[in-house]
């Protein structure tokens, strides 16, 4: 735990929307009188029919969560139409291509035209309110148009990260029974093409075998690369939008109508379709965007995430556009053409607020300061971090080298399920401690409990729960509300269990210590160990697999796989590489194993349960305190695992 404290910067305090007194006053009201607080702040978006009650929620029983429930609104209207009178010619999106010489600016007027046309294309091909549309796209403006077009007509979008494999895409199409897919001929990342249309074709064939038939595929031409074509099913985006009108009225949506499904990893193998609804989500995304980033009208905001993750949904698309900000959308990667790319983009587009992940910060820190120093970064006023806890060394580098000691850092903690930021400093209100997410946002009530569920007071180390709802909270898991209740509300009755461990210090600051369930956080992306295990076991030579995380210098957590082969087979380097490739093709490159250890057996209890605690310790090269191994069916396997570990300190 870092002992250093950085007081609120004078310059940040002077112009901040919220100082410490205001934070304390608002926070108290948000906790003591949530109905009054949220009734007031719900008005930050436009409503066709105003709500009469803000909050109607319970974390007990079937966990019904409803916010602003009798109000009518439309997300697309709030992100576009309401800005047109005053700011139609303001840049809504700055698109920076993978190639540093290609960029594009889209005004709010142009955004309106593009979104309305795409909405009309969807309607022309039979997409109705409530239908699920899968978006499998690279970081191009059309991905944003697709999300907003769905929200305009009441269709529910399911964005799938363009780095996922055809198998992963198919699983997500099948789960939400999506019949319309929007994709690209190819994506471009780091100068290399990504075969999105080809992957989509494979995924559609897999889905069809599970009786989910995709009727239409709308294809954006990005590279002009050669693609397969199914006449009658496949449609060119540029041809379709030319046939329709540039106006489409927004559908009046109930606040609790579904807005999107986003799949996230759970501790069991099947990804969960987290469902967010319309009113509460937008209020919360817009409000956190304004106050956490201390956003001022006309500023340029860059979140370097991908729209395939929740961070992209809330802080590239919905939060910034609801606030009439200029949002930067970057197609490429931080190290192409070289490791100075982020800082060059900041100078080129005069970015004021920059929000990225600790993994990127650590890898760019490793490349040395020269790449940073050749840019001025003089437009920067605020830095943010998201996706995983940031280690103090990376925080200090980000603050001192990137921000020149003049930009506050907001280290934000939240999840796919929370819709927006829950714990974070506010730049004009919060003294900073490197590595701490600091204090809860308005309306957020954290609680630490021990493994038995006993509430821990004061400075303590425990499991992080939330004891009351906030507007951005997910409402269910698509098609499986029982799983929603079981996953989040059954471990500690009446509380939302985050799955994260957390320490609270004597100042009441929160320090996230990492996952306490079977979920990995690799480069800020969640991956279920069970997902990786089932990918490994699907290989014909693998009899059993166990996957754990271990500390990784760049990614935060690396993926360590223990593999038992079928009888008569020996592990070797060639097979190790084959298995790594196999996992990549089953899930995608983000799931690429870092270490594969062949093991004759895994440590199991007599009831057959794998003792992951032991595997974690061995993966961490820390087996001095393995605890009680007497319950193991075959204690001898532990010695073999230790002898053949892949992570020896000397290695």
UniProtKB/Swiss-Prot annotation:
Where along the chain is Mg(2+) bound?
537, 539, 542
Free-text description of this protein's post-translational modifications in UniProt: Acetylated. Deacetylation by the SIR2-homolog deacetylase activates the enzyme.
Task: Output the Pfam families linked to this UniProt entry.
Answer: ACAS_N (PF16177), AMP-binding (PF00501), AMP-binding_C (PF13193)
Q: Which residues form the signal peptide?
A: none
Q: What CDD domains does its record include?
A: ACS
User: According to the UniProt entry, what is the EC number of this protein?
Assistant: 6.2.1.1
- Positions carrying N6-acetyllysine are 609
Enzyme group, top EC level?
Answer: ligase
GO CC terms, sorted: cytosol
Q: Where does ATP bind?
A: 387-389, 411-416, 500, 515, 526
Q: Where are the transmembrane segments?
A: none
- Keyword Secreted in the entry? The reply is no
GO terms for biological process?
Answer: acetyl-CoA biosynthetic process from acetate
Catalytic activity annotation = acetate + ATP + CoA = acetyl-CoA + AMP + diphosphate
Functional description taken from the UniProt entry: Catalyzes the conversion of acetate into acetyl-CoA (AcCoA), an essential intermediate at the junction of anabolic and catabolic pathways. AcsA undergoes a two-step reaction. In the first half reaction, AcsA combines acetate with ATP to form acetyl-adenylate (AcAMP) intermediate. In the second half reaction, it can then transfer the acetyl group from AcAMP to the sulfhydryl group of CoA, forming the product AcCoA.
- Family in the record: Belongs to the ATP-dependent AMP-binding enzyme family.
| Name of the featured protein | Acetyl-coenzyme A synthetase
Organism, scientific name: Allorhizobium ampelinum (strain ATCC BAA-846 / DSM 112012 / S4) (Agrobacterium vitis (strain S4))
């Amino acid at each position: 735990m870092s002992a250093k404290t950085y007081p609120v910067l004078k310059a940040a305090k002077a112009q901040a929307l919220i100082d410490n007194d205001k934070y304390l006053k608002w926070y108290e009201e948000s906790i003591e009188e949530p109905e009054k607080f949220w009734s007031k702040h719900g008005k930050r978006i436009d409503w066709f029919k105003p709500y009469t009650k803000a909050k109607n929620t319970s974390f007990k029983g079937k966990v019904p969560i409803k916010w602003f429930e009798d109000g009518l609104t439309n997300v697309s209207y709030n992100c576009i139409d309401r800005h047109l009178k005053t700011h139609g010619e303001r840049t809504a999106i700055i698109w920076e291509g993978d190639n540093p010489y290609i960029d594009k600016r889209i005004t709010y007027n142009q955004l309106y035209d593009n979104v309305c046309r795409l909405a009309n294309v969807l309607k022309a091909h039979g997409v109705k309110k409530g239908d699920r549309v899968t978006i499998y796209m690279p970081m191009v403006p059309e991905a944003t148009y697709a999300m907003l077009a769905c929200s305009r007509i009441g269709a529910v979008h399911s964005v799938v990260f363009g780095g996922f494999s055809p198998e992963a895409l198919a699983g997500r199409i099948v789960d939400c029974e999506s019949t319309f897919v929007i994709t690209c001929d190819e994506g471009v990342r780091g100068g290399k093409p990504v075969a999105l249309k080809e992957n989509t074709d494979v995924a559609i064939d897999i889905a069809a075998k599970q009786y989910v038939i995709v009727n239409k595929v709308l294809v954006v031409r990005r590279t002009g690369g050669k693609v397969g074509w199914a006449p009658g099913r496949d449609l060119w985006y540029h041809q379709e939008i030319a046939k329709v009108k540039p106006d489409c009225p927004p559908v009046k949506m109930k606040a609790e109508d579904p807005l999107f499904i986003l799949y996230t990893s759970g501790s069991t193998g099947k990804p969960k379709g987290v469902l967010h609804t319309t009113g509460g989500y937008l209020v919360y995304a817009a409000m956190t965007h304004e106050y956490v980033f201390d956003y001022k009208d006309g500023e340029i905001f860059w979140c370097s995430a991908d729209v395939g993750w929740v961070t992209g949904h809330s802080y590239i698309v919905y939060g910034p556009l609801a606030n009439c900000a200029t949002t930067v959308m970057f197609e490429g990667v931080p190290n192409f053409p070289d490791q100075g790319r982020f800082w060059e983009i900041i100078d080129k587009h005069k970015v004021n607020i920059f929000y990225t992940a600790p993994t990127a910060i650590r890898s760019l820190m490793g490349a040395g300061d020269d790449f940073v120093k050749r840019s001025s970064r003089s437009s920067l006023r605020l830095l943010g971090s998201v996706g995983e806890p940031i280690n103090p060394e990376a925080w200090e580098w980000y603050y001192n080298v990137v921000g020149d000691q003049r930009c506050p850092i907001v280290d934000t903690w939240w999840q796919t399920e929370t819709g927006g930021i829950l714990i974070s400093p506010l730049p004009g209100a919060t003294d900073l401690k490197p590595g701490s997410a600091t204090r809860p946002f308005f309306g957020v009530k954290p609680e630490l409990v021990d493994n038995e569920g006993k509430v821990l007071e004061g400075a303590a180390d425990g499991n992080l729960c939330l004891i009351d709802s906030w507007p951005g909270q997910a409402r269910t898991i698509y098609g499986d509300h029982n799983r929603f209740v079981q996953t989040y509300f059954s471990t500690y009755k009446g509380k939302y269990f985050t799955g994260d461990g957390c320490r609270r210090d004597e100042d009441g600051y929160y320090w996230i210590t990492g996952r306490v369930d079977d979920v990995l956080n690799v480069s800020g992306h969640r991956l279920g160990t069970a997902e990786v295990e089932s990918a490994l076991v699907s290989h014909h030579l693998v009899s059993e697999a166990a996957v754990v995380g271990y500390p990784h210098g760049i990614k935060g957590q690396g993926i360590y796989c223990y593999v038992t082969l079928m009888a008569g087979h020996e592990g070797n380097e060639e097979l190790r590489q084959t298995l790594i490739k196999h996992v990549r093709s089953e899930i995608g490159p983000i799931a690429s194993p870092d270490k594969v250890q062949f093991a004759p057996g895994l440590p199991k209890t007599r009831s057959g349960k794998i003792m992951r605690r032991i595997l974690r310790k061995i993966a961490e090269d820390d087996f001095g305190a393995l605890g009680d191994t007497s319950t193991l069916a075959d204690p001898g396997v532990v010695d073999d695992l230790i002898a053949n570990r892949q992570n020896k300190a000397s290695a």
